[in-house]
């Protein structure tokens, strides 16, 4: 059942005139700064923040991840030539790293010379962990001066040592390590572009609080390792919920400049704890369901107005009320919102170029209801009758006919809960 709030005809004062419709379409397009060719995308630009911490040794991995990631690092001074070529031709940024004081400056120089688009140099890896870099602030300060000099020589932006909760006596707290390090007379915050941190806490709220701690340094934040691992998730669905909540936060957090998932593949089985692998083993390599979520996840690209007549995936939102909104994957690798429930809302940027009613693809085992708004104005309250089960996807045609041009379309759940798959005309 549809409860009209605003007549769809009122948006078209020139209804009935082909010339009027063309003028109206041109007016909307011109006002929104869109291309008059009506050639609008069906996907967003990939996220400039999204990356992985991973050593690409299998050529099959690159085309699966490169459409979604903008950068990567492998804890080393350089990467193999095959990966480097792929990075150069697919708008991906590789970041060399000085893992500890024993790095090879010559290897880094050679890599930067061969790949002049290299922009960043990563600092020491977890110096407050005894099984990693294992250095006190005072011990790190000496070799750090050489790293600073190398970054300046190569015109690279320098990223701080990457900190986690540690095992080094007296330095469990990464903030304590950083505070002492930056207070040393031969160390300066001015030498670094960003603060690097790692986090394996399985609670998304704990991750968000952890990120906030490092805002005190007034630098962009790079989360260069993260996944849910402490405590270990009981299944991959828990890892999916974690990923969605944390990515929803970091993509929208202006303090987070980059993040890198740990990691796309390990030596363990894909279906073994902590269930964080993005790629399968063997050949041909495929994305795991978690990998599908990671690569298709919204980049919150507010410049893209997706063609509504081509279908807008429910996961392609540009704003949302609740960061805990989670995604799942169908058998044909389509993402959908799981359990969209009362009190939650999601915004989409859509481009309309046909006078057709809005359709919603969904599944639900309870009767549900949503309010549809366009550009902040409620258009209709729509009843979503329950389907026979959550595997039965239903397409409901509403009476809402969006006006031509670019618009912000909001779905707000008023009652019930349902899985949402797609919006289209």
Positions of PLM-derived features:
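Bacterial Sec-dependent N-terminal signal peptides
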Residues: 21, 27-46
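Aromatic- and acid-rich polysaccharide-binding/catalytic face
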Residues: 96, 125, 177-212, 217-230, ...
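Aromatic-rich peripheral "rim/lid" segments of glycoside hydrolase catalytic domains that contact
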Residues: 95, 262-311
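N-terminal carbohydrate-binding/catalytic regions of secreted carbohydrate-active enzymes
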Residues: 49-119
């Amino acid at each position: 059942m549809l409860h009209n709030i605003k007549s769809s005809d009122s948006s078209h004062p020139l209804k009935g005139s082909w010339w009027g419709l063309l003028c109206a379409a041109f007016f909307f397009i011109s006002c929104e700064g869109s291309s008059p060719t009506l050639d609008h995308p069906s996907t967003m630009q990939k996220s400039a923040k999204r990356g992985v911490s991973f050593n690409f040794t299998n050529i099959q991995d690159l085309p699966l991840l490169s459409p979604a990631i903008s950068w990567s690092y492998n804890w080393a001074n350089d990467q193999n030539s095959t990966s480097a070529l792929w990075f150069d031709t697919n708008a991906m940024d590789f970041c060399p790293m000085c893992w500890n004081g024993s790095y090879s400056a010559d290897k880094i120089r050679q890599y930067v010379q061969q790949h002049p688009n290299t922009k960043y140099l990563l600092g020491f890896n977890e110096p407050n962990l005894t099984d990693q870099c294992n250095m006190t602030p005072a011990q790190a300060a000496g070799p750090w001066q050489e790293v600073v000099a190398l970054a300046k020589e190569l015109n690279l932006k320098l990223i701080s040592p990457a900190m986690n909760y540690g095992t080094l006596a007296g330095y469990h707290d990464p903030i304590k390590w950083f505070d002492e390090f930056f207070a040393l007379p031969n160390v300066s915050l001015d030498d670094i572009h960003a603060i690097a941190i790692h986090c394996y806490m399985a609670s998304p709220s704990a991750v968000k609080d952890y990120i906030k701690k490092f805002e005190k340094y007034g630098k962009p934040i790079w989360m260069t390792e993260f996944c849910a691992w402490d405590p270990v998730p009981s299944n991959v669905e828990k890892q999916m919920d974690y990923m969605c909540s944390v990515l929803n936060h970091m993509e929208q957090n202006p303090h987070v400049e980059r993040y890198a998932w740990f990691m796309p593949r390990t030596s363990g089985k894909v279906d073994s704890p902590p269930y964080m692998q993005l790629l399968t083993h063997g050949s041909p390599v495929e994305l795991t369901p978690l990998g599908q979520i990671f690569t298709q996840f919204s980049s919150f690209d507010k410049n893209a107005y997706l063609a509504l007549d081509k279908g807008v995936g429910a996961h392609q939102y540009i704003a949302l009320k609740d960061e805990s909104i989670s995604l799942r994957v169908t058998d044909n690798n389509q993402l959908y919102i799981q359990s969209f429930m009362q009190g939650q809302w999601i915004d989409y940027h859509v481009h309309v170029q046909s006078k057709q009613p809005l359709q919603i693809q969904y599944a639900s085992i309870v009767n549900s209801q949503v309010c549809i708004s366009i550009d902040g104005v409620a258009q209709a309250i729509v009843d979503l009758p329950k389907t026979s089960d959550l595997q039965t996807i239903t397409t409901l045609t509403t009476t809402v006919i969006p006006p031509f041009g670019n618009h912000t379309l909001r779905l707000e759940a008023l009652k019930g809960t349902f899985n949402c798959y797609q919006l289209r005309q």
